[in-house]
From Swiss-Prot:
Endpoints of the signal sequence: 1-20
Subunit structure: Monomer.
Positions annotated to bind Zn(2+): 335, 339, 345
Database matches in SMART domains: ACR, DISIN
Cell compartment(s), UniProt: Secreted
Function noted in UniProt: The metalloproteinase-disintegrin-like HF3 is a potent hemorrhagic toxin that activates macrophages for phagocytosis through integrin alpha-M/beta-2 (ITGAM/ITGB2). It inhibits collagen-induced platelet aggregation. This protein shows cleavage specificity for substrate for leucine at P1' position, followed by hydrophobic residues in P2'.
Binding site for Ca(2+) 3: 469, 472, 484
Disulphide bond pairs: 310-390, 350-374, 352-357, 406-435, 417-430, 419-425, 429-452, 443-449, 448-474, 461-481, 468-500, 493-505, 512-562, 527-569, 540-550, 557-594, 588-599
Keyword Disulfide bond tagged: yes
Official protein name in the record: Zinc metalloproteinase-disintegrin-like HF3
GO biological process, one term: proteolysis
Glycosylated residues in this chain: 259, 313, 373, 519, 584
Natural source organism: Bothrops jararaca
Lineage: Eukaryota, Metazoa, Chordata, Craniata, Vertebrata
Binding site for Ca(2+) 1: 202, 286, 390, 393
Amino acid sequence: MIQVLLVTICLAAFPYQGSSIILESGNVNDYEVVYARKVTALPKGAVQPKYEDTMQYELKVNGEPVVLHLEKNKQLFSKDYSETHYSPDGREITTYPPVEDHCYYHGRIENDADSTASISACNGLKGHFKLQGETYFIEPLKLPNSEAHAVFKYENVEKEDEVPKMCGVTQTNWESDEPIKKASQLVVTAEQQRYNHYKYIELVILADYRMVTKNNGDLGKIRTKIYEIVNILNEIFRYLYIRIALVGIEIWSNADLSNVTLSADDTLASFGTWRGTVLLKRKSHDNAQLLTAIDFDGQTIGIANIASMCNQNKSVGVVMDYSPINLVVAVIMAHEMGHNLGINHDTGSCSCGGYSCIMAPEISDQPSKLFSNCSKQAYQRYINYYKPQCILNEPLRTDIVSPPVCGNELLEMGEECDCGSPRNCRDPCCDAATCKLHSWVECESGECCDQCRFKGAGTECRAARSECDIAESCTGQSADCPTDDFKRNGQPCLHNYGYCYNGNCPIMYHQCYALFGSNATVAEDGCFEFNENGDKYFYCRKQSGVNIPCAQEDVKCGRLFCHTKKHPCDYKYSEDPDYGMVDNGTKCADGKVCSNGHCVDVATAY
């Protein structure tokens, strides 16, 4: 018999108004105090693991009771996970620590379908959860003989008043610089577009010597930070059907093994070369990210090679340890890995339902865990075009568990599924006794799969995102939603204020809204004449690194000008050459759209 015991958090809901406290996450000026008491729920007589597979907590947030459900992230580590550091005389020291009974969880809030959670339960509860659309952080208070925790919002963490930080990627596209009609002519098969089937990235994270000195030589603190970051990465990338397996970390505890300089570009190039010539020879993996404590020149906090996943010297990124809040660093790393997966920076016409999206070139006031519609489309195109083999297939498990053991919840050679023991199996498609799919199973996952069977023909599987898009429906013969299609490019939309372009209706008003907020409108025509200057800020396009001035008829296809409370000719500029420019496909005159810095007839543009 299973003895079910509640896990309770008793809350004293009294925010310390006007006071502040120094936590690992920084100086917090408004928080609530939570007292946690945990009791396990196990079969009678069972050996209690240090950290249970599932846990439940009851707590109050803003005086309202909530129930937090947590489930251990069993796919966080690969079974051949290793850790490497270096002795003072430079000797490589590699260990293979046991990681099965780890303390990193994902979760949700009961009765809140949009909720998420990423929590470390190693020493109290540390992490974040999303409740009713708002993100809260929880962290243990360092009080003697106390189980007190602080609950607070990101906005209550004091931040330095500094210029906005940016991604250092300036390459605008991994595809050829062809006319914009190329995107509308993409043709992919149903098999090629199976981007919604899970991919697996085997990740190695390296910490440079500055990370060691920043943390006073405490390698355990660096390891914990990396674990929490990767746990968050898994939460983020599941929306792209990607799982991140940490196969190793390496800490340059004695000296940097590649050049880490103030130049982010040089650091990336050196790290990529070292990864391809040294690291890959001793540790199999798909992607490597360098976590550094250096403060790069300019506004850069991260950089990566675009469309480079699986490439020997280029499947890398460099991320600055910009914040003590691990969610912020994880979002930066997710951004750079997004570039590795062929995703470019978001423009004004991209949206994710939040204030900002992961691939925004400038770090947001509120860290976002959401990829935009543009990011999802770019990732799908990349998968279809490049077919990066190292992530298309689930990693072989021969190096993880051998021989295969049915019932251990690991999919191994010879198994079609593995949902655990017959008592614990929750997968209706899987026969837990044999680790084979039931004979009647038609599918396991996909937008057109429900309870192991294909959804009926005509069932909508992808809603139209705009009047320029087309809703897709299941065929009844496949688990996959048909290829994302959209209305003909150049068709008028939004009451003739714009023309359809790849399923969207890009107009300047929406782009101003995205850049400056709801009070912004499109500036007067005279503002756009600045684009004839061809200087650092105002131009139509770049050619061989040179800013090309706009011809008079093209001025509305260069820098975007918006009327704001601050200025009638307001604009945005950053190191990213696309940021703040008028989006391709935007109406620039009656019957004309922007195409690579030119205002051309809509009939010839597509």
